[in-house]
Amino acid sequence: MNYTELEQKIGKQTESDWHQASGGGWIHKDAKVKNELNIRDNAIVMGNAQVYGDARVYGDAWVYDDARVYDDARVYGNALVYGDACVYDNAQVYGNAQVYDDARVYGNAQVYGDALVYSHAWVYGKSERD
């Protein structure tokens, strides 16, 4: 995805506020990403979001607001993680799933399909939510 395509997804932006990650995705200047190689494909990390450890965001996934993705977590497909949500340990969020507000997904949990995890919900261990 080039910058023009990025603008089509998120609206008019100042180009200098963005840079393309080494892995191919896009990172906003306010977001904190430990390893740019882990932001791949058309993924977007913006706002005050943080991605660190060996966490990966790829496909068409978005991580934004104050959300955090870390450890060995994966967010991919068309998944959205936002608000104050956290995805960590070996958790995976994918498909069209959304994790937001103060929700937590961790351990070996998987959230996928059209699942919504929000408010103060916790999904953990070997749980699956579709």
Enumerate the predicted regions with their spans.
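Long terminal segments
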Residues: 118-130
